[in-house]
């Protein structure tokens, strides 16, 4: 990460409390342009909540979120916050564990929905853009199918194309391969790798796929009980972690 | 082999459909015997059949207008019940509670007889709006009444759409209204159509209550002739059979519609899992 380039994502002191459960305890995170950050850690450590705070699907209890220069400061909902929230969401793409494709829309309709509805793009232009996104993830031939007729791997690739069609500044992946049959994981990881290495997409990925992390991530960040306790390039972190908790987790999963 | 085993072995030779047909035939025979036991005046029935049948178009018209009014009211009611706006939520909560909690026949009388009494407070040109004919009153009452019931159907339909759908739409930057209109409602309406068909069938029968304020529909005609000649059962049997026939026809079309709607959601054709 170039130190002088403005980060695409910048979290400061992000806390998230559900009831009396403090899931995030004041997290700071910067993600630079073109950087791929993998967040890893035990389930329940707050990884997904952290990711969902970036596009404000979870609203932080306190702290601030900044994406592509749009700043959101935690606080009660008002017009300004809601507008910042939508601005941030239209600049981020999110890929969910269980795809969440729109079942009543065909593949291409899934992909052009947001450009047309949110960005008011003319349908013909959105179609061209949508087809480019579908080609990028290798499912252009399925454009007129309905999601129910796709395999899990195809569904997730369409979900990636749907997010790409908004031309986001950063892509967020929330355990994108956890719901897939083992033989379908590879095709999704290959698309993500291509996005990271060929297209230079800025990405924040929550995953248990340590092989992918070592190969693709610029930085890996270890989450433990609501804190990011250690981060660094894979080559340094794997085998050279300073914190015993990071070392123990890596030894267990690798 | 005992008797039961032999019967079961015999029974296995015939298809379920054949056995079902036999059951239906037996039911009709029993109905025919029952009909004969009443010693109905069939000549009288045949004589007045055309007069009663002439009420069918009005019955269908009232039902269709009623459902056309009920659907938008139900949609508003459902959105209101799910709304975080206290005014909208409160009004629709009252609407659903009050209308479902009072008899349809009372509502019909309130609209037909009660509204005109309020006309005196309205400015002159608007007074006409308070004094409604029997058909308009009936359609209004049916629409408002069924709208309240169907609001609960639509609400369940909206709630049946998974939260993941809402999150996916919001993650793409869609507003709450866009999410509702483009993502949630289309899926909610699909699951709401079969129960809405049921409501329509129920409405065909409840349209008979509109006859009580003097609409010349099916039930009104049947009871009028019945009272006039002191042969109430004869004409009411005719009315019952016509209502049954009407609802059966609509049930048939409802079944076809449901199968057609399921189509987009069923994996069919070749290779759903092909890669």
Predicted regions and their residues:
Chain B
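Transmembrane alpha-helices and adjacent helix-loop boundaries
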Residues: 1-275
